[in-house]
């Protein structure tokens, strides 16, 4: 039976984890990637980064972060040889082993294929059977214990019943990722490149991965938006349109350094604006003084009965002086404005702001959800009776496959229960990657909000969407052209700014496939929501940031 608790996490409550992870048996390596002025161009010739990339990657664990679309996947392919640079060069000292969700999407026929070890394993097996070729001898060199290493790696990954011949189609998304990570453990590569390795992993598997990373003695390049995983790295590189920024330390130090840089940039902008204001005030005073001086000179000339030729000469001199002063002042103003613009470019954007409609607020005591003798389909554990009132924030946790998504779909009316009932007493909305993908691809966000009878006038909608960092460049685009993070924010806006705004949000792994900044923006938006939340997520930091009032542990 599921269990519900309120308030803080119970003392000593830890999720179960796969077996302990031994340190890699592969000796520590001096492997390094060297990026020397590396650039990559899109098919239309556009440079992906305004500054070419130069970086040395040696021993230790390097984290790579950045918004979706800045080229993290391209960088991974450049590092591992999947792409050739358009400029500069990539130097590799040794063999790299890549774990990447797009590779798993091709659904290799067997586990050995997904582990990247099928060819070497087949060579070892042919050698053992006395059928080896000369190529097999090369492939099997130093790999005599590969079958044992594979079995141990699969067991360490919590997959003791999986063999190299198991079809990948028989495994869940989380199990497929663990298979790929087991391949990295068993491979005798000099360096590991892990691209979003915690995707589809539940909390116990993420904890296992974090422990393994800390114990791994080979260089690791980790591309991730998982804040807990990024706490296991030694250095973080942030990739953006302008290129690379390097930060020493793990995620905590990265945040501290970014905050310090943001504070310094804000102070520099304030200083530049103050300097401009002071200089402009001085220019105005000097201009007024020149005007007074020229007026006095004209009066003196008239009273001195000077000749017309002399007066004309004085006038021409004054006009030339005025033109020179105007040009000089314009140059000064231009330089001051440029200094302010340059300082402003270094200032991070203000945090995304989300303001829900008053109708989304749930008052204390208002019944939100009631479950009566609910039995989920597919044999999931029963829910006896449960009811929730007021602006509750329920964290729904449990391992992959335990029925969390099924529960949310039954509550939302998308699946019928096997028995019993789930009754919603307030308007609701489902917020997940599927809901975001279901937005009408050909409609703009503004058009869709009008379709939903939003009570907000267009000007206010634009203002609110801009506060969510969905500016003019986004709201006029077809929603199919928006990124995953932008579509999720669009789905949130539609849920809470429609004619009948949602008072309860059902969130199913909403941060999957979001970059780190988009995750933080969604987190801040939900923190200010005054309705009720029911959130299923393996992102522990995301859950804790929402300050759950109830914790609903769903059994395996």
Residue ranges of predicted features:
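Conserved H-loop
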Residues: 227-232, 253, 539-545
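ABC transporter NBD signature
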Residues: 68, 172, 400, 483
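ABC-family P-loop ATPase nucleotide-binding domains
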Residues: 103-170, 433-503, 509
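ABC ATPase C-loop
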Residues: 185, 388, 496-498
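Coupling and communication elements adjacent to P-loop NTPase active sites across diverse families
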Residues: 2-12, 27-41, 120-177, 257-378
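Catalytic Walker B motif of ABC-type/P-loop ATPase nucleotide-binding domains
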Residues: 192-196, 201, 431, 504-509, ...
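Hydrophobic anchor residue at the start of the ABC signature
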Residues: 181, 492, 511, 522
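ABC ATPase nucleotide-binding domain signature region
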Residues: 61-62, 73-136, 238, 391-402, ...
């Amino acid at each position: 039976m599921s269990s519900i608790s309120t308030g803080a996490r119970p003392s000593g409550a830890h999720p179960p984890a796969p077996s302990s992870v031994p340190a890699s048996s592969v000796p520590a390596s001096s492997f390094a990637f060297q990026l020397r002025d590396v650039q990559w161009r899109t098919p239309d010739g556009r440079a992906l980064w305004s500054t070419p990339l130069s970086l040395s990657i040696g021993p230790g664990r390097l984290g790579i972060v950045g918004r979706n679309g800045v080229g993290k996947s391209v960088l991974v392919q450049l590092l591992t040889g999947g792409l050739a640079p358009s400029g500069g060069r990539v130097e590799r000292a040794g063999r790299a082993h890549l774990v990447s969700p797009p590779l798993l999407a091709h659904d290799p026929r067997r586990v050995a294929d997904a582990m990247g070890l099928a060819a070497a394993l087949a060579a070892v097996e042919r050698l053992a059977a006395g059928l080896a070729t000369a190529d097999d001898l090369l492939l099997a060199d130093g790999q005599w214990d590969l079958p044992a290493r594979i079995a141990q790696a699969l067991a360490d990954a919590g997959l003791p019943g999986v063999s190299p011949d198991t079809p990948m189609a028989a495994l869940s998304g989380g199990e497929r990722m663990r298979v790929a990570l087991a391949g990295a453990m068993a491979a005798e590569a000099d360096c590991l490149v892990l691209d979003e390795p915690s995707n589809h992993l539940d909390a116990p598997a993420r904890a296992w991965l974090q422990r393994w990373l800390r114990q791994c003695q080979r260089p690791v390049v980790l591309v991730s938006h998982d804040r807990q995983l990024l706490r296991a790295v030694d250095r973080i590189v942030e990739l953006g349109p302008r290129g690379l920024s390097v930060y020493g330390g793990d995620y905590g130090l990265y945040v501290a350094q970014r905050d310090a840089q943001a504070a310094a940039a804000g102070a520099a902008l304030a200083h530049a604006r103050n300097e401009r204001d002071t200089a402009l005030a001085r220019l105005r005073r000097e201009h007024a003084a020149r005007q007074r001086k020229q007026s006095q000179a004209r009066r003196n000339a008239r009273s001195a009965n000077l000749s017309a030729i002399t007066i004309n000469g004085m006038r021409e001199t004054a006009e030339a002086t005025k033109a020179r002063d105007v040009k000089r002042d314009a140059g000064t103003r231009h330089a001051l404005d440029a200094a302010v613009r340059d300082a402003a470019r270094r200032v991070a954007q203000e945090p995304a702001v989300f303001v829900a409609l008053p109708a989304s607020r749930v008052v204390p005591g208002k019944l939100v959800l009631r479950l009566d003798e609910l039995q989920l389909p597919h044999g999931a554990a029963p829910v006896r009776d449960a009811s929730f009132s007021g602006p509750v924030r329920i964290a729904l946790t449990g391992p992959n496959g335990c029925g969390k998504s099924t529960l949310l779909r039954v509550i939302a009316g998308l699946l019928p229960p096997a028995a019993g009932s789930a009754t919603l007493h307030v308007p609701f909305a489902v917020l997940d990657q599927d809901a975001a993908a279901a937005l009408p691809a050909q409609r703009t966000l503004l058009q869709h909000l009008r379709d939903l009878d939003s009570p907000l006038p267009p000007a206010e909608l634009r203002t609110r969407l801009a506060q969510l960092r969905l500016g003019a460049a986004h709201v006029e685009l077809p929603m199919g052209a928006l990124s995953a993070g932008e579509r999720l924010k669009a789905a949130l806006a539609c849920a809470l700014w429609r004619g009948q705004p949602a008072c309860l949000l059902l969130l199913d792994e909403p941060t999957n496939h979001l970059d780190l900044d988009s995750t933080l923006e969604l987190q801040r938006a939900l923190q200010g929501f005054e309705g009720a939340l029911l959130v299923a997520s393996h992102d522990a930091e995301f859950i804790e940031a929402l300050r759950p009032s109830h914790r609903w542990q769903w059994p395996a």
